[in-house]
């Protein structure tokens, strides 16, 4: 599949990378409908955060669930979902207090590459929120703001 990778300062490429797969029972694979560029994605692009090997870009996303791990119960294949920039379990005391980005088991989604055709989402039950139906294509870009807000509480 294709994915955006940062190879160095002002060096952005669309590369072929392996398709993500279910690694843990709580994972989901999402076919991305939209993703955005965050200011923190621009730090390595501008050379402020130097990189020595290609790194993934993007961590705010929405799309359609393609596959779920054995323990996932909150979303199913075919659901349109919005995901947080941090994967979180949404069960620990910190999450239950509304601070999912500080979850005891949090995982940054930037490492998963949300600027791609598909993405693996760990802790899917705590990270993904399904919409009641597939949104109108004109609404999808607006849902990206939710991706940032979901993790900040």
Summary of predicted features, one role per range:
Residues 3, 17, 41, 63-65, ...:
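Buried hydrophobic positions in well-ordered alpha/beta secondary-structure cores of metabolic enzymes
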Residues 5-7, 46, 65, 96:
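Residue-level signal for short segments within beta-strands and strand-turn junctions
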Residues 8-10, 35-37:
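Short polar catalytic/cofactor-binding loops
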Residues 11-18:
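Short glycine/threonine/proline-enriched tight-turn/helix- or strand-capping micro-motif at secondary-structure
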Residues 18, 37-39, 102-104:
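Sequence contexts marking disulfide-bonded cysteines in secreted/extracellular proteins
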Residues 20-36, 48-93, 112, 132-135:
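Glycine-rich beta-strand-centered segment in the early N-terminal region that forms part
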Residues 40-46:
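Cytochrome P450 core scaffold surrounding the K-helix E-X-X-R motif
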Residues 89-153:
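NAD(P)H dinucleotide-binding glycine-rich loop of Rossmann-like/cofactor-binding domains
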């Amino acid at each position: 599949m294709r994915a955006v990778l940062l190879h160095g300062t002002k060096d952005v490429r669309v590369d072929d990378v392996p398709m993500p797969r279910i690694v843990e029972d709580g994972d989901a694979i999402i076919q991305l409908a939209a993703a955005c560029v965050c200011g923190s994605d621009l730090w390595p692009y501008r050379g402020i955060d130097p990189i020595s090997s290609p790194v993934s870009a993007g961590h705010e996303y929405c799309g359609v669930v393609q596959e779920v791990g054995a323990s996932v119960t909150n979303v199913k294949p075919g659901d349109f979902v919005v995901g947080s920039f941090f994967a979180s379990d949404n069960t620990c005391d910190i999450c239950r207090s509304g601070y999912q980005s500080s979850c005891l088991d949090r995982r940054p989604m930037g490492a998963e590459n949300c600027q791609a055709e598909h993405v693996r989402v760990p802790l899917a039950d705590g990270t993904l929120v399904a919409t009641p139906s597939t949104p109108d294509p004109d609404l999808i870009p607006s849902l990206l703001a939710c991706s940032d807000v979901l993790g900040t509480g």
